[in-house]
């Protein structure tokens, strides 16, 4: 009888780690309840608020123009994998099992038909490649379970952007993703580190809801590059702004009466103490005139919040 009790106790202990794991497989729909402007139309030019960027990143962002994405050779390029934290697409997560043992070899996160590559999170203990190994749009990710959270460490991403207004991300950046499921809600939190462009880590998150319709695309549609702007047909044409020539450098700051150092981000702007430095330098606008109610700044009646 004692032997049976010991065997039963050991079986419970052995099963505990597996029991803590959560099934993430399925279709997940994006929840558009935060930062509708950032994840919809896109951030304002010159808006680097909330980013712990350094001077090099700021200067690179101020020379950026969205016309560069319209170049024929860039029209079908993916965003890097940090885009999963700022995009509005749905995703599909698949479990890849060993056909013999049934162990989980990897988790695959689809791109949801968007402009980023799928993510494969390896769970079989394989090491990360050399620091000098080639980069890819999918990066290289390995995962482990911490309680009921899947934690994935990603390296070897290509150079990309932190925001769609040109804030850069270097190919030396790494990202830690936390997948947390609460019933029908899936939260993905990302911690981004970049020794080239960030002075501190950047933390972002995205929420998804289980999608019973199952209509999230498993793969991206075929992309056919073409010249979107006739002016880009000229060989050697690369859209850009030379330092100090970007006409939108101060548009965001002026619209919201922000001092430039507040609009241009940086580590010091992330902390509450920075508010004290704005005393006497910042006057809030009298009323909201943009993005006041829903994405685009219009309520369902077609009026801005100011007009109601």
Functional labels for PLM-detected ranges:
Residues 15-17:
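N-terminal signal peptide c-region/cleavage motif recognized by signal peptidases
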């Amino acid at each position: 009888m004692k032997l049976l009790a010991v065997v039963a106790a050991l079986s419970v202990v052995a099963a505990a780690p597996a029991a803590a794991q959560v099934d993430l497989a399925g279709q997940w729909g994006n929840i558009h309840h935060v930062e509708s402007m950032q994840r919809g139309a896109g951030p304002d030019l010159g808006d680097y608020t909330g980013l712990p960027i350094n001077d090099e990143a700021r200067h690179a962002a101020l020379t950026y123009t969205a016309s560069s994405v319209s170049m024929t050779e860039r029209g079908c390029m993916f965003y890097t994998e940090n885009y999963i934290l700022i995009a509005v697409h749905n995703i599909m997560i698949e479990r890849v099992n060993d056909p013999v043992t049934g162990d989980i070899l990897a988790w695959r996160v689809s791109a949801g038909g968007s402009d980023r590559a799928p993510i494969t999170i390896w769970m079989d203990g394989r090491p990360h490649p050399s620091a000098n190994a080639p980069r890819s749009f999918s990066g290289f990710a390995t995962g482990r379970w911490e309680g009921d959270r899947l934690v994935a460490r990603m390296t070897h991403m290509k150079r990309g952007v932190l925001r769609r207004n040109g804030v850069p991300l270097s190919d030396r950046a790494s990202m830690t993703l936390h997948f947390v499921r609460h019933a029908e809600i899936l939260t993905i939190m990302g911690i981004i580190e970049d020794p080239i462009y960030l002075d501190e880590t950047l933390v972002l998150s995205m929420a998804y809801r289980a999608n019973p319709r199952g209509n999230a695309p498993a793969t991206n549609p075929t992309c056919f590059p073409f010249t979107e702007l006739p002016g880009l047909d000229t060989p050697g044409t690369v859209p850009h702004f030379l330092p100090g020539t970007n006409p939108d450098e101060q548009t965001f700051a002026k619209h919201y009466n922000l001092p430039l150092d507040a609009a241009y981000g940086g580590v010091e702007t992330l902390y509450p103490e920075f508010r004290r430095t704005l005393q006497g330098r910042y006057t809030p606008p009298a009323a909201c005139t943009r993005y006041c109610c829903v994405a685009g700044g219009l309520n369902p009646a077609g009026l801005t919040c100011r007009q109601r």
